[in-house]
């Protein structure tokens, strides 16, 4: 363990747009090699495409609902007890849950882009719409985490 003081978390600066801090965090996750302006263009284009494909919903509300649908509630943590490693189900903190959801959406869009011949913007739009409808790769990742936690419920008495 480090003897230094605890590291304070730096707040994410919002651009003052309608999406707020969550959208700013999403742009930071989408960003690659420090190209933030490109990431902002990709995200805003994907939200506009999602808004045009859906009926009556704004892009930001689609994004917020998609993220809340992908956020995991439970996950497993490894703990060594008496020479045996157990997978212990624990509840996920709010900030970790949000960041996992954002990462899963971006990861699903990137893998989909490699499989298909579409642009990253359209793949991101499709993944957001699928997460909005509780389908898609990102939702499968959430369900996989929950299934692992359910399978190891017997070890929940080894809480951290």
Curated annotation (Swiss-Prot):
**Per its UniProt record, what Pfam families does this chain match?**
Ribosomal_S7
Q: Keywords in UniProt for this one?
A: Ribonucleoprotein, Ribosomal protein, RNA-binding, rRNA-binding, tRNA-binding
Q: Which InterPro entries would you find in this protein's record?
A: Ribosomal_uS7, Ribosomal_uS7_bac/org-type, Ribosomal_uS7_dom, Ribosomal_uS7_dom_sf
Q: Name one GO biological process term.
A: translation
* GO cellular component terms given for this protein: small ribosomal subunit
Q: Where is the signal peptide?
A: none
Entry similarity comment: Belongs to the universal ribosomal protein uS7 family.
Quaternary state and interactors = Part of the 30S ribosomal subunit. Contacts proteins S9 and S11.
Q: What does this protein do?
A: One of the primary rRNA binding proteins, it binds directly to 16S rRNA where it nucleates assembly of the head domain of the 30S subunit. Is located at the subunit interface close to the decoding center, probably blocks exit of the E-site tRNA.
Q: What is this protein called?
A: Small ribosomal subunit protein uS7
Look up and give the organism this protein is from: Anaplasma marginale (strain Florida)
Q: What is the lineage of its organism?
A: Bacteria, Pseudomonadati, Pseudomonadota, Alphaproteobacteria, Rickettsiales
